[in-house]
């Protein structure tokens, strides 16, 4: 009997050891393996011999009033999100990989329940003081107590503790690879500075920081100048070699984009990304373009893309019925807008995983059906029988077929025409809602959309407000419909929970106000499957079907190409990264600059 108990104890102890084997690595990937091997020299998309020097001047729209990117009020200055280095950093030619920056390496349990991060002993803040494990612990606590509520929700129960001067231990409340890696992107604050400042409050002066650039001058609301840190401790790390080549980065603020565009053409700043299709087609002309002083470049995007949508606030009674949301989607004539207003510059959004293999572009396969079938009674039938595609019009400005379909859906939902007005068949209440827009937004498309809705008897009021009012109304969910940018997602990540899970209903990221047990179930499975592509593929596609067929948001468009123009005073590596424009790899070319008109030679 004693022998059997002893053997059982040994077996249990051995199982415990096996269940939490300890691993160590210098680099990590959410899916698969990191692209770059241990002791790699530099990223493939940089020129490690790029010369340092010169200035690049960029533009920003609006104004700024502080230097704290994490403040809960105010407008932080351009580039303030890059003041601080992070424990690990990513590369721009692969999704979801992490390489050492402040950290040197990490050892972790193979079930991702904990990780111990070793800090590089050379890591320094700009005043020369060392970055320590205590600073990492302090930073996490700062975010938990004074940061945005979403951070506290995601990391509730997680602990971060300095267990040695240069070692920090993270214990996760919910073991998971992606949650562990998400904390690798944590910026590290100096405790000695931030212990006397609230993270939620604006800063009138730049904080003590640690990145490759520091703020050296500014005029509040008008311009910011960043200077390269000449003794930057991490300049020669593999992740930084060939990057951060400009001595100075200057941002000039403009209140109006048209004024900014004319300033660019006059040489007041150096580089402009163009989002207005008409501008790109008609205004990038003149002698400076003819003589190639200004380069106009358009490159196809092959990676996951940001997409634009109109979010229905489905907690408003007017949008609680899916048929109403579908009817309004049918009234959005993308083909006409794209041809008449945008010079066919946009592509139509059709997925929350645009340009990735996780987009549901075929009929559901067996693996997806296993996931979806148990929830069939709570799903639109189209999830199982059709491939989602936004309505397509003839592009003539009056698509009778789509409007007839919309009329049928509205009647089925209890909204009937009375004269020229769409009213509720029971209460007589008109079908009316407000479209909330940022004051600075391009709204060429709004009036045609409004006119199309009027043909259905629907009244859409238009209200433009400044950014602070937009933020306040989002936080209080005081809107009917508003535009949203859905950020590119290379794979279905645990970030989805902030945008769609019922637990995060008060998050401003959940613009439609969705609370769905079906979506909660899929997202919980996605979180559990992080790192497992075989499981994530059907889960991502299943979620995509559920979201699109429920019409929580109206698909607008996305940019299939990057449109960029710059004064020809820069050189860049032969290889462009897939997941960014790669401006951080460019350098000032004195020979090119010498050939330009004098007005555009700034930066020498």
UniProtKB/Swiss-Prot annotation:
GO molecular function: ABC-type oligopeptide transporter activity; peptide transmembrane transporter activity
UniProt entry tagged with the keyword Signal: yes
One Gene Ontology CC term in the entry: ATP-binding cassette (ABC) transporter complex, substrate-binding subunit-containing
Keywords: Signal
Region forming the signal peptide: 1-19
Signal is among the record's keywords: yes
InterPro entries membership: Peptide/Ni-bd, SBP_5, SBP_5_dom
Family to which this protein belongs: To H.influenzae HbpA.
Record's protein name: Uncharacterized protein YejA
Originating gene: yejA
């Amino acid at each position: 009997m004693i022998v059997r108990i002893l053997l059982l104890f040994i077996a249990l102890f051995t199982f415990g050891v096996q269940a939490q084997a300890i691993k160590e690595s210098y680099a990590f990937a959410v899916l698969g393996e990191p692209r770059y091997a241990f002791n790699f020299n530099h990223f493939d998309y940089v020129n490690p011999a790029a010369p340092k020097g010169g200035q690049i001047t960029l533009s920003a729209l609006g104004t700024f009033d502080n230097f704290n990117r994490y403040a809960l009020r105010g407008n932080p200055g351009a580039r303030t999100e890059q003041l601080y280095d992070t424990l690990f950093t990513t590369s721009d030619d692969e999704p979801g990989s992490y390489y050492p920056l402040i950290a040197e390496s990490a050892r972790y349990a193979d079930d991702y329940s904990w990780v111990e991060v070793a800090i590089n002993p050379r890591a320094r803040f700009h005043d020369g003081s060392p970055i320590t494990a205590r600073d990492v612990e302090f930073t996490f606590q700062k975010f938990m107590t004074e940061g945005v509520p979403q951070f506290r929700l995601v990391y509730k129960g997680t602990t971060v503790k300095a267990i040695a001067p240069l070692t920090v231990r993270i214990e996760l409340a919910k073991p998971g690879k992606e949650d562990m890696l998400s904390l690798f992107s944590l910026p590290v604050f100096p405790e000695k500075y931030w212990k006397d400042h609230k993270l939620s409050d604006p800063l009138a002066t730049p904080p003590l920081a640690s990145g490759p650039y520091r703020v050296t001058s500014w005029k509040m609301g008008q311009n910011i100048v960043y200077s390269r840190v000449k003794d930057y401790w991490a300049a020669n790390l593999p992740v930084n070699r060939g990057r951060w080549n400009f001595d100075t980065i200057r941002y000039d603020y403009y209140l109006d984009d048209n004024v900014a565009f004319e300033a660019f053409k006059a040489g007041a700043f150096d580089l402009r990304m163009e989002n207005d299709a008409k501008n790109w087609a008609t205004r990038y002309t003149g002698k400076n373009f003819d003589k190639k002083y200004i380069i106009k470049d358009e490159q196809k995007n092959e990676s996951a893309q940001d997409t634009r949508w109109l979010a229905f606030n489905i907690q408003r009674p007017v949008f609680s019925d899916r048929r109403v949301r579908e009817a309004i989607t049918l009234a959005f004539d993308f083909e006409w807008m794209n041809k008449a207003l945008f010079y066919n510059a946009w592509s139509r959004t059709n997925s929350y995983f645009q340009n990735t293999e996780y987009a549901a572009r075929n009929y559901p396969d067996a693996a997806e059906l296993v996931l979806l079938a148990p929830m069939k009674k709570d799903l639109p039938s189209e999830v199982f029988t059709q491939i989602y595609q936004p309505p397509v019009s003839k592009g003539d400005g009056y698509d009778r077929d789509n409007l007839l379909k919309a009329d049928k859906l509205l009647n089925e939902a209890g909204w009937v025409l009375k004269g020229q007005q769409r009213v509720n068949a029971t209460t007589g209440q008109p079908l009316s809602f407000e479209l909330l827009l940022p004051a600075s937004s391009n709204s060429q498309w709004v009036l045609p959309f409004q006119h199309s809705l009027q043909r259905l008897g629907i009244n859409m009021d238009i209200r433009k407000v400044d950014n602070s009012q937009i933020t306040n109304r989002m936080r209080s969910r005081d809107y009917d419909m508003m535009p949203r940018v859905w950020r590119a997602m290379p794979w279905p990540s645990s970030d989805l929970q902030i945008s769609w899970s019922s637990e995060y209903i008060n998050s401003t990221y959940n613009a439609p106000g969705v609370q769905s047990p079906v979506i909660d179930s899929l997202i919980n499975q996605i979180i559990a499957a992080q790192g497992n592509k075989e499981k994530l593929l059907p889960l991502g596609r299943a979620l995509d079907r559920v979201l699109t067929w429920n019409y929580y948001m109206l698909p607008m468009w996305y940019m299939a190409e990057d449109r960029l123009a710059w004064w020809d005073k820069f050189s860049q590596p032969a290889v462009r990264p897939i997941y960014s424009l790669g401006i951080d790899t460019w350098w000032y070319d004195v020979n090119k600059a010498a050939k330009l008109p004098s007005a555009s030679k700034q930066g020498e």
